[in-house]
Each structure stands twice: as C-alpha cells, then as structure tokens.
Amino acid sequence: RYVITQTLLVRSTQPETVAAASQTVSELVSEGVVLSSGEQYGSGGPTFVFTGLNKLKPAMIAQATARAREAAQQFAQDAGSALGGIRQANQGYFEILPRDQAQGIQEASQMNKVIRVVATVEYLLKD
C-alpha cells in the first residue's frame, strides 16, 4: 500500500468551473482511490478565497455613508429637527461572510460571499 499526499492550488476567474471539477472526485473513489481531508477520509472540496475587496471598498463606503445620511435625515424629521453637519465619522472593518449561514460550513468552502462594512456617522441636529 502506498500513501501519496498532494495539495493542488488553482487560481481561476471561473470559480463555477472549479466547483464543477471538484464534484467529479467520486470517479476517483469508484476507481479505488481513497481521498482524505486532514485527519478524516473524504474530499474536503475546494476553498474559495475572495480577492477583489480593494476594488469594492470605495463604492461600499460611499453607499454606507449615503445610507447613514438617509437614516439620520429620517431621524431628524421624526424628531422635528433639521439635519446638521457631520460631527464624527468612523469606518468599521470590512467583513467577508458566507452567503448562506449554516452551522459547520465555513466561509471559505462557499463560493458565494457577502461583504459588509459598517460606517458610524454622527450628525448634528438643528432645532
């Protein structure tokens, strides 16, 4: 009996193709190849890493800031006040999450991601 260990790194702009290819490992199993993932037997499947965050950051910050202003305007209107200028603003950290939240399924194993940022903007109110 022989044990061969190999890790394959694939960089692709077509993650759907990589996911489809990973689904064909059952053919290897039917030929008698034993696959392992760490300490457990069975294929671990591909890991999907999102690398385009820097391209999205400016638009996401602009959108978060615009939504903060809309919420502040509504708050001011409901309070019978007018919205003043920005008192303070902080950009939170960017978070990459799995699109589908499921117990035991990690973000990296899911091809589709959700990216979020929280911007905290404090406005002054005018009476």
Model-derived regions, located:
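Short, charged, surface-exposed interaction patches
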Residues: 1-127
